[in-house]
Curated annotation (Swiss-Prot):
The keyword Disulfide bond does not apply. It is found in: Cell inner membrane. This is p-hydroxybenzoic acid efflux pump subunit AaeA. It is a single-pass membrane protein. Gene3D superfamilies: 2.40.30.170, 2.40.50.100. It comes from Klebsiella pneumoniae (strain 342). The chain crosses the membrane at residues 12-32. One of its GO terms (cellular component) is plasma membrane. One of its GO terms (molecular function) is transmembrane transporter activity. Belongs to the membrane fusion protein (MFP) (TC 8.A.1) family. Forms an efflux pump with AaeB.
Length: 310
């Protein structure tokens, strides 16, 4: 009898332990797979592609690659003598037409004052027409001068904001054309994280929810807040034909892969360029409040580590 009772008790304890282990593993699995998190996340920042508005030889480069610069700091200079001469020529044209316009203005005024008693209507109209033509030429000369002055100012390529110069591809003596990208500027204090979450996990993601960001290869966790969720993603199965009609590919796959939706996360504190734009991270959306890891069980902590390093 005692042996039977002992066997039953042993079996019951074993079954209970197996059930508890199964429940714990199942909850950890659900926590790992169903909760909103992703390893497909990247640090990003506002990046300005800097291109000159004038063409010419680069006469001076004032910065180095990956240097931190301030707003309006001169990055490099394009051949200025040519644009200085163009401005001087434009200013000479303005001075010439100003003098000519003054002469024609006096002449037209004199003829209009004398009137048709002293000369013909045709001569009066001719003087007025010449004055209008010269004033038009003066306006064009002023516009050309202003444009030449603007071109001269833009021979100095300046930083549009505080940030880091990166991918600097300009050298003294090199010819650069207008509109060709010469350098990229990563704006300071504009870093954020773009997390690509599966559509099956979006139910637990809302703007304002808290997030934990763990950079790849780092044990440091950064706090952030969900800023926005993308309103749409590209449909790879659909396109338009030559007549503009929708063309949908046949899709009978047995396995349906969840689409990934971009979620923008605002960092609580800017980290400088400690994690450059484009580097990867793991993101966990913790809900309306930050996660209290002290209450997590062993399996949940194991899942957290798998997320960060798995």
């Amino acid at each position: 009898m005692k042996t039977l009772t002992r066997n039953i008790l042993r079996t019951a304890i074993t079954v209970i332990l197996v059930i508890l282990a199964f429940v714990a593993i199942f909850r950890a699995w659900v926590y790992y797979t169903a909760s909103p998190w992703t390893r497909d996340a990247r640090f990003s920042a506002d990046i300005v592609a800097i291109a000159p508005d004038v063409s010419g030889l680069i006469s001076q480069v004032n910065v180095k690659d990956n240097q931190l610069v301030k707003k309006d700091q001169v990055l490099f200079v394009i051949d200025q003598p040519r644009y200085q001469k163009a401005l001087a020529e434009a200013e000479a044209d303005v001075a010439y037409y100003q003098t000519l316009a003054q002469e024609k203005r006096v002449e037209a005024g004199r003829r209009n004052k004398l009137g048709i008693q002293a000369m013909s209507r045709e001569e009066i109209d001719q003087a007025n027409n010449v004055l209008q033509t010269v004033e038009h030429q003066l306006a064009k000369a002023v516009a050309s001068r202003d444009l030449a002055r603007l071109d001269l100012e833009r021979t100095e390529i300046r930083a549009p904001a505080d940030g880091w110069v990166t991918n600097l591809n300009v050298y003294t003596g090199e010819f650069i054309t207008r509109g060709s990208t010469a350098v990229a500027l990563v704006k300071e204090n504009t870093f954020y994280v773009m997390a690509y979450l599966e559509e099956t996990k979006l139910e637990g993601v809302r703007p304002g929810y808290r997030a934990e960001i763990t950079p790849l290869g780092s044990s440091k966790t950064i706090k952030g807040t969900v800023d926005s969720i993308a309103a749409g993603v590209t449909n790879a199965s659909s396109s338009s034909d030559s007549k503009g009609m929708a063309s949908v590919d046949s899709n009978l796959e047995w396995v349906r892969l969840a689409q990934r939706v971009p979620v923008r996360i605002r960092l609580d504190q800017q980290q400088g360029n400690l994690w450059p734009s484009g580097t990867t991270a793991t993101v966990v959306i913790t809900g309306k409040e930050d996660r209290d890891t002290s209450r997590a069980n062993f399996f949940q902590k194991l899942a957290m580590r798998l997320r960060e390093f798995g």
